Amino acid sequence: MQSHSGNETTPLSQRLTLLLLTENQPDFLRRALKYYSSYPCNVIVVDASPAPDAQVAERAGLQYIHNAALSETGLSARIAEGLKQVSTPFVVYAQVDSFLLPDALTEAVSFLESNERYGTCQGYSLGYQAYVDHVDYFRRDRKVHEDYASDQADERLLSFMGQSVSLLNAVTRTGLARQWFTSVPEGTERHWQEIGHMAFLVAAAALRILPIPYALHVNAGKEAEHRYGAAIAGAVKHIDPKAKAERETLARLVVSSLGNSRDLQGEQGEHAVLAGLAAMAECLETQPYQGGEKIISSAWNVALTQADAQFEPRQFVELPFYNQPLFDELAQIEFLIHLLPAGQVQMEGLESVLVKQAELLRVQSNPDAESLLSRLWQAYAHYSFSHSVVQRLADELGKSEDEDDIERAERIVAWGQRLQSDSAFDNSQLLRGMPSGKLLDWLDARDPAPAQLKKLTTQLTRRPAGSQIGILLLDLDADVFKLQATFDSLINSHYRAFKVVVFTTGGLPATTSLNDTLHFVKVTESNYVDKINQVVKQASSDWLMLAQAGEEFTRSGLLLASAELIDAGQCRAVAVDEIHRQANGTLAPLFRPGFNLDLLQSVPTLAARHWLIRRELLVEAGGYSREFPKALEFDLLLRLIEQGGMSGLAHLSEPVLIC
């Protein structure tokens, strides 16, 4: 290779332009701009979102192109739009959810500057998927022949296309990039754009794959990756007339885009391109277009404030990913990923942990609740990238005179400073814009104002008859933590007239009676239904609700329900609304309609739980049936309907539980 490099003193911003492509990805865009902020190349953002991003448009040192019409176009048209503004000799393009490694870009530029015969250069890439607490990495590229330097374009085509390597994110001479992307007809399918791009670049000039880590590209998921890989493979492998015609069309496009190439012209050139596609088809007979095997899972170690990589059993050591400089770079990327979250998968996980943090840090009225410091440590362990959590933990530790706490406070303060240096935004505020956060804000807004709260409390004190609510709390797993969560929610609520009977398989913490606000009854799996029915007969509460340990009561739900029950003499049973804690930890409302027998029978797990049952009617109905231990409430409601029809079955539009 001949070296003609003379650009060592020319600023990188005059040598390389990075085109960042985005559409409705503001979080990814901000993260990408932060990642590349210290890399001194020229940056152009091409934004196809419906509305421009004013904050990004005003950033210094950045060219921002907003064109909403590009949303109706393909990849090539978007890149072509950005290329209009490129004045550097080299260009590279990436989606905003990718990370092109700066050192690799610089090395690729240096290689092309030193070797004029080469038009394109890149290294090897990984796939990644970010979660709230870890990042998974996937093999994407395979080890391939790395130098395609033949003087004959047809030889380069045959050799490179037989390797099936994407070049969409390679550093390319700007002239070649314009030559291709301005030639691609609108409406060309994405997979044909990628295949054509590969064929054009290797036909136009020599090509180099450097043995270095080059980029991270977000993993689209197994199904999406499989569909796209199948489209690529089908395009070059299928033998039906339509597929054959599409290949011939692409061959003509590649040859025409090359212009006056002396190597590939006319039918001879088209045959060379088709031969390259055939070589690609042969390659894809035995392997997928891109790999998808998970090779590393890197969890963020809260204690050490760094990434902790765990390797999968199968590795690909022939690839250049096993070196300390790369892992140092990945650690910096992971820090950014967690500090500036983006993408559906990560944001869904973040919503869950932010809900948990909000619950841990709410004001506690229960003197037996966990200490604030203990709850702050738990919140920090769930997600250590919330400024407010870090600050509150540091403040609380700072109050201690214990030497260990003082040392911990210093570490937490240093961590907070590191967060602040890269982003001043408090990620805990993201909850306000998420479904769970909006639901929690809505619940808070339903709290009675102080004057109304005083009025309701006075009203219930003066007219207690007929409105007192008792909770039958099942603790069949003897889980003290779940019990504590339920107790905390009751004590934090505005309702004070409740009585709770806990039916537990665990040891009794104290000797209590039904006259106490909190009464414990020892039960077994075989007799708890009978024990419940005994308590129902003796209880003094007017209304009873069956609940499970761990379910939490909203702050004002029981109070507002009790106030409604004062004048509900005609009601036999009342359904209430609920907030459901979903499997992923997020919250969703369950707003029940008025009583509907069809709904009750079709989805009893949703429609039959947490009814307020008038105690004397529960006794008259014979209590709960031990024949249906998994459907106690559903069976009871059906018997109440058999005895008295559907009259007196009501619904209260008030969320009473989070369950």
Q: What label would you give each PLM region?
A:
Residues 105-138, 556-587:
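Conserved donor NDP-sugar-binding/catalytic core segment of glycosyltransferases
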Residues 126-133, 168, 183, 204-241, ...:
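Active-site donor/metal-binding and catalytic loop motifs
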Residues 34-42, 488-497:
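Short, acidic, metal-binding catalytic loop of nucleotide-sugar glycosyltransferases
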Residues 1-13, 282, 287-469, 474-481, ...:
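Non-catalytic membrane-proximal stalk/linker segments that position and tether the catalytic domains
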Residues 91, 544:
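Short aromatic/hydrophobic "clamp" motif used to bind/position activated sugar donors
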Residues 176-180, 187-211, 617, 627-648, ...:
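A short, conserved alpha-helix in the catalytic core of glycosyltransferases
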Residues 69-85, 523-539:
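Glycine-rich, basic loop-to-helix element that forms the pyrophosphate-binding segment
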Residues 140-162, 586-609:
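Short, flexible, basic/aromatic active-site loop/helix in glycosyltransferases
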